[in-house]
């Protein structure tokens, strides 16, 4: 399909993933709910106000939870090369005001799809807003991660699995960019950092002597007491049982 001008559509994504690619670039923007973009062995979580630029001929898939809505922008190759790909970030976010305005315009676009004049006016406005957002976001070069935000997210979700994709969404970065910046700043990988957070909490709970080790393992997000014991021993050189006895 040849695209000569940018085109927009509003979609609700289902839970299934179907990989595909096309000869034109795309920008996908979260409007409501939560969606996930899988691209080149990475996953990107798209919450409302978060967007991602997909280059032409790149294999990708979309999926979403219930009540999600995304705005899809198909781009002609010449616009992509001159007006979009000059910006380094594939992953970007909108400020609250711009997100609200784009959401309202997307609703109008969906409800009045048969009005060609209105649709063209809305499309032009959307194109300008998204281009401006890409420019503003690219100017905000991320040099250091906000570890307070990341730590807060980790602490609130320690009882479950925490993926790099989730943490990168908190930092408003693409997964690969977040991983490299995190390792450079902290000296360890995100996975190792989360594991240490789990084990730090485990030590604290064991010291309080109010919960059995099986419950400690569960509260700290380990799939089994065995995996908890192995991780604890690797980091601290003794088993949780031994540590429990040692601090009495």
Curated annotation (Swiss-Prot):
GO terms for molecular function: DNA-binding transcription factor activity; sequence-specific DNA binding. CDD domains: cupin_YobQ-like_N. InterPro entries: AraC_XylS_family_regulators, Cupin_2, Homeodomain-like_sf, HTH_AraC, HTH_AraC-typ_CS, RmlC-like_jellyroll, RmlC_Cupin_sf, Tscrpt_reg_AraC-type_HTH. The keyword Transcription applies. Residues 165-186, 213-236 bind DNA. Residues 148-246 form the HTH araC/xylS-type domain. Keywords: DNA-binding, Transcription, Transcription regulation. Probable transcriptional regulator. Its target gene(s) is not yet known. This is Probable transcriptional regulator LumQ. It comes from Photobacterium leiognathi. The gene is lumQ.
